[in-house]
Amino acid sequence: MSKEKFERVKPHVNVGTIGHVDHGKTTLTAAICTTLAKVYGGAARDFASIDNAPEERERGITISTSHVEYDTPARHYAHVDCPGHADYVKNMITGAAQMDGGILVVAATDGPMPQTREHILLGRQVGIPYIIVFMNKCDMVDDEELLELVEMEVRELLSEYDFPGDDLPVIQGSALGALNGEEQWEAKIIELAEALDTYIPEPERAIDLPFLMPIEDVFSIQGRGTVVTGRIERGILKVGDEVAIVGIKDTTTTTCTGVEMFRKLLDEGRAGENVGALLRGTKRDEVERGQVLAKPGSITPHTKFESEVYVLSKDEGGRHTPFFKGYRPQFYFRTTDVTGDISLPEGVEMVMPGDNIQMVVELISPIAMDEGLRFAIREGGRTVGAGVVAKIFE
């Protein structure tokens, strides 16, 4: 049996289910796989195989996640589903599963519950750009007005967190009904798939974004000048391009006079490639690890931001004790550690291992950052937390 060839013809989109415990996220995941396999072809997955999610380790954090795939005529989807609430929190904060869009599952029998709100807030903080709502268990509610009421509540809750609650798609269905092959509910799964296709725009590929490369190493090559090396995070670097050196010190600009990979000279380096870039007129001591090379004007250095943070539990190798205000760990961005001060939300005195928390961070030196940038919190080289930049202040 030969392995099936992965056809790169359709656009690839990453999605996932979010929402309160027992509202039917995993059942819906199984229903999407099964219904779309039936209608458009592909592999069906049953509830048990998805629910029995394998443990993964992302930056030392243990996360249970199920990955499934399905196709619509227009696209290929990779979909993540997590068994427990804590797994969602970790997944969203570490960016282990980057989502281009989320499917918020709300049981019509319960309406929005505490984790519904928490997942919406997390989605806002970590930058999930689009949310589609699947109101589940609608076969258990006879009252039309009650369904309308729940839909209204969910829309209002999403608007509260700056999602377009009035305009985003809400599909009323039954995941279990669809799994059991009932046609009226299978039709709702197809409707959900169509909403995914039309409401979530095709994500921009890394190569189409403005150029950025974190600097890992700096060398000076006699007679040629200074070479910085790193893995290009996004965009393309062409010989002759003007580039900015951003972070830690004042931003400067220079010209890239050469790109090399494995000692071979290239015309350009692309997202995902490890390259060395030769910089015109830049001295060895003017650049350092932790800065980035970027398209001028595309990214700016900052010191103060709001973040959403997950603090590793003792079992994950994190701290054994809580920390308090006045805590000054290192924040590891891309390739380097920078010390920072934290301030905790009002009324929060201490943070326990295993908690997730919003905190404002002020770094001692500026780092090139955008909202959505992930970082680790470290003490003497040991990772004790993971976070994401939610909002930049200065």
From Swiss-Prot:
The main place the protein resides is cytoplasm
Would you tell me the Gene Ontology cellular component terms?
cytosol
Q: Which residues form a coiled coil?
A: none
For region G1, the annotated ranges are 19-26
Query: Please, which domain of life does this record's source organism belong to?
Result: Bacteria
Q: Where in the cell is it found?
A: Cytoplasm
Q: Which Pfam families match?
A: GTP_EFTU, GTP_EFTU_D2, GTP_EFTU_D3
- Where are the stretches annotated G5? 174-176
Q: Which family does it belong to?
A: Belongs to the TRAFAC class translation factor GTPase superfamily. Classic translation factor GTPase family. EF-Tu/EF-1A subfamily.
Protein name, UniProt field? Elongation factor Tu 2
| Gene designation | tuf2
